[in-house]
A protein has these predicted regions:
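Single conserved hydrophobic/aromatic residue that forms the stacking wall/gate
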Residues: 1-7, 11-12
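Conserved short histidine dyad/triad with adjacent acidic residue
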Residues: 15-30, 74-76
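Short glycine/proline-enriched turns and hinge-like loops at secondary-structure junctions
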Residues: 29-31, 84-85
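Long hydrophobic alpha-helical segments typical of transmembrane helices together
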Residues: 110-129
Length: 129
């Protein structure tokens, strides 16, 4: 997954994500912030969840969408995203507030971990990897 930060202000963050074929993002949250996601190209599957319990971890899938270009999802607290196609897909994500880490929910292990946000580029400048 290749993500580019295309804008960030005090109250909003824009992230453009390029999804290789058949790649998925794990179930994740946005540090309590809302996320709106718009499919730009390709077809993505978006599943939205609600947290029932943290210990032991229990999530309930409340929505599942197969999303063509132009589909807008949100506001979402916890979701997963998957590229269903044999081609690349892109999506634009808008967050209510900037954040540097997100929570990853592993329902098989019953764990919640934190992951630092990683970008391919920020404001059109490539990041050093």
């Amino acid at each position: 997954i290749v993500a580019s930060l295309v804008g960030s202000e005090m109250c909003i963050r824009d992230r453009l994500v390029c999804w290789p074929p058949h790649i998925s993002a794990p179930i994740h949250g946005h540090e309590g912030e809302k996320c709106w996601a718009r499919v730009q190209t390709g077809e993505l599957k978006i599943c939205n969840y609600v947290e029932i319990n943290r210990d032991p971890l229990s999530l309930e899938k409340i929505q599942e969408f197969e999303c063509p270009p132009g589909f807008l999802d949100g506001p979402a607290d916890i979701h997963s995203v998957e590229n269903l196609s044999d081609s690349f897909a892109t999506s634009l994500h808008i967050y209510a507030k900037p954040y540097e880490e997100c929570e990853l929910f592993d329902t098989e292990r019953g764990t919640v971990t934190k992951a630092k946000m990683d970008y391919h580029s920020i404001d059109s400048v490539l990041c050093n990897k």
